Amino acid sequence: MIIYISGKVTGTTDYKERFAAVEKRLKVDGHRVINPIKVCRHIQPGSPWVTYMRTCIRALTRADAIYLMRGWRKSPGARLEQQIAVALDMVIMAQEKGD
């Protein structure tokens, strides 16, 4: 299964590590993973939020499922990605407290 990782980035400093840890765990479980941090690494730092989101949404549409990291509801981008995933009838996975 191809899984897109979704979570809070803006306003955090540890997002690269958090997304990398989730990516590693999902790959160990045998999944192909779309990590938006890697997908957006070509974007010039300081670019508008919408520039990142357009790239992320294109990547999301290539996935079969979305993995919602803890705290995703605090992120406007992650909430938008979740709404798109629901509209596209994707599998919705959510990080548990112990994950």
Task: Set out the residue ranges of the language-model regions.
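Conserved catalytic or regulatory cores that recognize and/or transform ribose-phosphate-containing ligands
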Residues: 1-99
